[in-house]
Amino acid sequence: MHFEPYPFEKLTQLLEGITPNPAYSPIALTIGEPQFETPAFIQKSLSKHSEELRRYPKTAGETYLNDSMRGFVERRFGVKLQPNELISSFGTREVLFNFPQYYLFDKKEPIMAYTNPFYQIYEGSAIASRAKVIHLNLTEQNGFKPIINEAELAECDLVILNF
């Protein structure tokens, strides 16, 4: 199994040994780590409730958190989710890599579709899942909206849409 290096790793290698022009401020093309301090009210609340962090969280997530997230999705996107249609996690990478492997495990020749450009973890999960990939190209011509025809959709075992 061969996984491609992340684009940020490739960029780091490309930039090795290059001295930037001191007349310009470089643009940080990082992995999206926060570049600001945690707001004081969050620090205060975390400190106040830190004793509660001594156990692992529930696998299914806390009911109040799931209710809040489902409410957000309904308000923002007009989609009413059922409690079993939501996964709570500390980050997306692990879920997006592992879920397709779990879901496609018993498929003989799995097929998954996802948008292109894509979050590279989708490619890794497709490789690990032995899945054929249908790229849903986002272009100016299609208004940067994923388009999949009925025939492609019928053969897909999993479609990942992100926005």
Predicted segments — roles?
Residues 2-91, 98:
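N-terminal small-domain helix-loop-helix segment of the aminotransferase-like
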Residues 53-163:
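Conserved core of the PLP fold type I
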